Amino acid sequence: MLVSKKSDLLLLIIVVFLFFSGNTLQANEKPQETMDRILEFSIKILEKSLQSENAFIRSAAARAAGESEYSGLIPLLKKAAKDSYHTTRLFALQGIKKISLNEARTLSIDMSKDLNVWVRGAAIEMLGELGDGTSGSIIQSHLKSPDRTVRYAAAGALFKLGDESQLDILLDGLKGGSSIDRYQAIGYLGKLNDKKLTPYLEDLLSGNEDEVIFYSLKAIGKKADQDMLPRLLNLMKHVNPSLRYQSALTLGELKGDSGLDALRSLCSDENAMVRLSAAVALVRKKSDYCHEIFSVMIKDADYGIRSSTARMLGELEIQNREQLLLMALMDKNIRVRTSATRAVGMMGGPRAFPLLLSKLEDSQEVVRTYAAGNIIKLMKQ
């Protein structure tokens, strides 16, 4: 088992674990043995959660096991892939990809026959990412599926394998059908990560359906370029706060100082999510402006805002991130604590250990589950 070479880190982990778990060292127990006990303790938490009668907890166990990136949890993920609840199966499939591409490829072939349309679509999509020449025939068999989601997934998967002949299935999906169907086509097109397809998404920004514009902005994401700047600046003035905050996040992906003044102006927007998104975008642009917003948002009266703030802090390197996440870990709301726990895992580093270890005895099983998965991840780094 891999551990840090720094003796102070080992001692920190041991002391904190003993403090929170109530365990005691054996008379001649070595630090490595204690580390192994922490690993075993965390694995048991995940195993227990996967046996829960609560489907939400089982799903958390599958997702947390994937976040651990630990090969020793592949058997647990394979078991989760056969769960009766479709979200648990979906998280198991997504999680195993983070650990073993070969296992993920094998599992995606099997789950391409799943009864749930979302799981089936995700498995087909994964075959496009991980498959080889033999995967094409499996994917093509789903092009005539009665489920639009599956057809979209198949067309996208073939595109990733170099076959662009079915791209019209996705492009046609942008034009008609129900709004939900259009959102799906937009999402799959965005996940192809091909800049030559971005103009199709950009064209949707000129429409009059707020939801279509919102999902198009999300799909464009990091593929945004300077040519989009005028549209983004215009959308940042939109009456719909969802469009203001999503256009701000997209603007944050542009390189350089473009749009800084517009982002700074949104730091005083009437909507909390817009203010938060502007602050996130400014951090991504290496600007120190509006950093105080994170300290305000982590204490907002709306638990949804507190949760979103905690989640975003996992991706951002700001000076007081650890202190803000500590506040979120002690929040009375389970959703906020869950987001904070996962964010601490994303933050990583020696200082993440005591924060995560403290959550192994949280009052809610879902928080303990995510803490266990992320502790395992940190121990393997």
Place the predicted regions along the sequence by residue:
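Amphipathic alpha-helical scaffolding segments comprising HEAT/armadillo-like alpha-solenoid repeats
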Residues: 36-49, 70-82, 101-113, 132-144, ...
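Bacterial N-terminal signal peptides
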Residues: 12-21
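Short inter-helical turns and helix N-cap capping residues of alpha-solenoid HEAT/ARM repeat scaffolds
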Residues: 53-54, 84-85, 115-116, 146-147, ...
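Core register positions within helices of long alpha-helical scaffolds
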Residues: 64, 95-98, 126, 157, ...
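N-terminal leader/linker segments that initiate helical-solenoid repeat arrays
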Residues: 25-71, 86-87
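Solenoidal tandem-repeat scaffolds enriched in leucines and small polar residues
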Residues: 147-225, 240-245
